[in-house]
């Protein structure tokens, strides 16, 4: 079978390599060198880490929503939501924005921001500092009328309790209060979870899954090839991209807090087996 090794990224280490760059709409890729890191391929785009201040160009993404996670600093998101003027949203460290597919948007930051983005390609951009990108693009927004999802991740995590003793047979009712749906994202959802124990084997049929370890540690077990499942130890500040269709599960002895961008539909195995290929699976 084709190798499906996950991408494992130490986000904190990658951020430490970057320097803050003051952007303008005319800034080129060469200008921003050293302030942007390509972390991994993800679905039809890239995971990026960015340190920037100033005013970015207007852009829009044609194939899917963009995920923006502010890790440090503050920013203002300007976005075209409908036929009216662009709207502004203040973002601070610990907040997430899901920017709808096709929506013109840009970020401004006076003092600087550090962020991680999941950015789909291709896209359009405008390298001029204008109040409304439609004055340059010449195309109406149409019947978009879609607002971005703005999530205060720290506030959402504070609502959750650690679920200890999780097993592959644990139900949604068992897990109530330990997991929360943050927002819709592409063909699935953003979720946050706190648990200790062992999750079920699962496989996502529509695309890669993005995992961000926010606190604690966990072991990712994943079927990468024809051999036995491989194990990867993840700690706070690390990211994993689980390839589309790859069977995987997590276990954590002391507890882990994680955020996921999970596509649907999925298949799951609610038995504690060493290899999911030996068991019957169900559609979730």
Where do the PLM segments sit?
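Short acidic-glycine-tyrosine-enriched beta hairpin
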Residues: 82-101, 224-244
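Ligand-binding loop in jelly-roll beta-barrel domains
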Residues: 92, 101-129, 235, 244-271
């Amino acid at each position: 079978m084709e190798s499906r090794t996950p991408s494992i990224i130490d986000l904190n280490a990658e951020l430490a390599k970057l320097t803050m760059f003051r952007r303008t709409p005319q800034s080129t890729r060469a200008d921003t060198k050293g302030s942007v890191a390509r972390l991994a391929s993800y679905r039809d785009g890239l995971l990026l880490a960015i340190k920037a201040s100033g005013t970015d160009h207007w852009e829009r993404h044609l194939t899917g929503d963009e995920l923006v996670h502010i890790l440090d600093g503050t920013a203002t998101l300007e976005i075209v939501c409908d036929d009216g003027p662009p709207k502004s949203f203040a973002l601070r460290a610990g907040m997430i924005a899901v920017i709808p597919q096709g929506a013109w948007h840009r970020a401004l930051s006076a003092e600087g921001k550090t962020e991680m983005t999941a950015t789909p390609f291709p896209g359009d951009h405008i390298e001029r500092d204008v109040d409304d990108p439609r004055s340059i693009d010449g195309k109406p927004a149409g019947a978009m009328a879609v607002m971005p999802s703005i999530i205060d991740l720290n506030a959402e995590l504070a609502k959750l309790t650690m679920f200890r003793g999780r097993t592959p047979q644990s139900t949604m009712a068992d897990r109530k209060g330990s997991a929360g749906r943050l927002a819709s994202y592409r063909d699935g959802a953003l979720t946050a979870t706190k648990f200790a124990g062992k999750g079920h084997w699962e496989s996502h049929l529509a695309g890669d899954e993005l995992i961000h370890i926010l606190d604690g540690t966990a072991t990712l077990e994943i079927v990468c090839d024809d051999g036995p499942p491989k194990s990867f130890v993840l700690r706070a500040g690390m990211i994993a991209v689980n390839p589309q269709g790859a069977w995987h599960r997590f276990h954590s002895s002391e507890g882990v807090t994680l955020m996921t961008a999970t596509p649907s539909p999925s298949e799951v195995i609610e038995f504690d087996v060493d290899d999911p290929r030996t068991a019957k699976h169900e559609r979730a």
